[in-house]
Amino acid sequence: MGGSEEAYSVYVLWSAKLEKRYVGSGKDPKARLREHSAGQSTFTRGGRPWVLIHTEVHETKIEALRRERFLKSGVGRKWLDEQFPQFRNRRKD
């Protein structure tokens, strides 16, 4: 990494309540987990509590956003299913 560029992370959360994963990115995945679990994100509020199941650190925000986009794609979801079979999306609502 060069200069003042900060590392960005891609994270995967799991909701046992919804039986769904959530993929996001940011500088501090543990802080984001607390926010999601506290209901501070409208999109994930109904799945509380959330558990952090995977984190990847990338050197730039662009790299993290590309990886996040990949993990949300069909191929990326399949990769997550293979890596974390116990955390497969089950509900289709």
Label for each model-derived stretch:
Residues 1-41, 45-51, 55-58, 62-77, ...:
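GIY-YIG nuclease catalytic motif and its immediate N-terminal context
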